[in-house]
């Protein structure tokens, strides 16, 4: 039996809109959007190539998961950076090379999650 607080949390979780940041042609982003649609969750997708992220949003992402999780160190963009740039990832680099950010980035109620797996999303939403 759920108490009133837990019931309230579940209702808020389902009704507050989810924001998904990524690149529209990314297969992992497509899987995440398909998952959300299949579960009838409302979401807003923001392609950060078309709509670069703000400094505040970058800081929210960084504080939510840390740069080690947020930055895609396997990306071609990351490997092309100089050693100095790799050690000093910042907002300016991310706006210059948006594919440095792992995809997708999901934000809801101040919670930040990076990447996608069915298990990860199921645990987050259920």
Predicted regions and their residues:
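Thiol/selenol-based redox catalytic cores and closely related redox-interacting motifs
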Residues: 48-126
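Short phosphate-binding/catalytic loops that engage adenosine nucleotides
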Residues: 41
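Short, Lys/Arg-enriched N-terminal segments with co-localized hydrophobic residues
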Residues: 1-14
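Local sequence-structure signature of Cys/Sec-based thiol-disulfide redox active-site neighborhoods
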Residues: 14-34, 44-48
């Amino acid at each position: 039996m759920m108490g009133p607080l837990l019931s309230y949390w579940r209702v808020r979780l389902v009704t507050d809109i989810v924001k998904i940041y990524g690149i529209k042609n990314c297969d992992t982003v497509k899987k995440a959007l398909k998952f959300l649609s299949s579960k009838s969750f409302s979401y807003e997708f923001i392609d950060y190539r078309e709509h670069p992220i703000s400094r505040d949003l970058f800081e929210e992402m960084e504080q939510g998961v840390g740069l080690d999780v947020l930055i895609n160190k396997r990306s071609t963009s990351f490997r092309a950076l100089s050693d100095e740039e790799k050690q000093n990832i910042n907002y300016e680099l991310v706006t210059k090379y948006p594919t440095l950010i792992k995809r997708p980035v999901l934000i809801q109620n101040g919670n930040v999650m990076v990447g996608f797996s069915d298990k990860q999303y199921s645990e987050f939403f259920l």
